[in-house]
Curated annotation (Swiss-Prot):
The record marks 116-117 as: Important for bifunctional activity. GO terms for molecular function: dCTP deaminase (dUMP-forming) activity; dCTP deaminase activity; nucleotide binding. The gene is dcd. Pathway: Pyrimidine metabolism; dUMP biosynthesis; dUMP from dCTP: step 1/1. The active site is at 129 (proton donor/acceptor). It comes from the Bacteria. PANTHER family: DCTP DEAMINASE. The keyword Kinase does not apply. HAMAP family: dCTP_deaminase. Residues 160-190 are annotated as: Disordered. This is dCTP deaminase, dUMP-forming. Its EC number is 3.5.4.30. Bifunctional enzyme that catalyzes both the deamination of dCTP to dUTP and the hydrolysis of dUTP to dUMP without releasing the toxic dUTP intermediate.
């Protein structure tokens, strides 16, 4: 069940849903607006000939922070990682779904490629997969609204929430745009 604004506020007030920093003006009818942090991960196109999800490629991306007061410019066809300004902590009975903002989508900005689902038990900043599909550069301002997080109540609490030893939670506690750790659980079929 999708939580309404009053349910979202009740979960936050009770301390079950953690959002830091929390700004009540970001609560929408059935979602919470999320803001863009100031750190980005850009791909180093000259370090590798290709991306291999089975291998650890430590120098695949570099962390970039724009000069204070300046935006990050995302060029047409470019893909970078960003993250939410807010740190989210979900209880074992709520899952999240990150969606883009309609106004930004109409400018050609995609907020996430595939990873819009947030497991119950997750705690950390949400990594954003930012793409510019427009034919002009888009400026990304730290602190701007970048997406919205919908919360879904599970039918029962998760038996093994994200962060538990059984869940294999490789992104638990992440801060800033976190590169892929796909090699940690990559499986090849034989």
């Amino acid at each position: 069940m999708l939580l309404s604004d009053r349910d979202l506020r009740a979960e936050i007030s009770s301390g079950r849903l953690g959002i830091d920093p929390f700004d009540d003006t970001l609560v929408q009818p059935s979602s919470i607006d999320v803001r863009l942090d100031c750190l980005f991960r850009v791909f180093n196109n000259t370090r590798y000939t290709h991306i291999d999800p089975a291998k650890q490629q430590d120098e695949l991306t570099s962390l970039v922070q724009p000069v204070d007061g300046e935006p990050f410019v995302l060029h047409p066809g470019e893909f970078v990682l960003g993250s939410t300004l807010e740190l989210f902590t979900l209880p074992d009975n709520l899952a999240g779904r990150l969606e883009g903002k309609s106004s930004l989508g109409r400018l050609g900005l995609l907020t996430h490629s595939t990873a819009g689902f947030i497991d119950p038990g997750f705690s950390g900043h949400i990594t954003l997969e930012l793409s510019n599909v427009a034919n002009l550069p888009i400026t990304l301002w730290p602190g701007m609204k970048i997406g919205q997080l919908c919360m879904l109540r599970l039918t029962s609490p998760s038996e093994h929430p994200y962060g538990s030893s059984r869940a294999g939670s490789k992104y638990q506690g992440q801060r800033g745009p976190t590169p892929s750790r796909s090699c940690q659980n990559f499986i090849r079929s034989t």
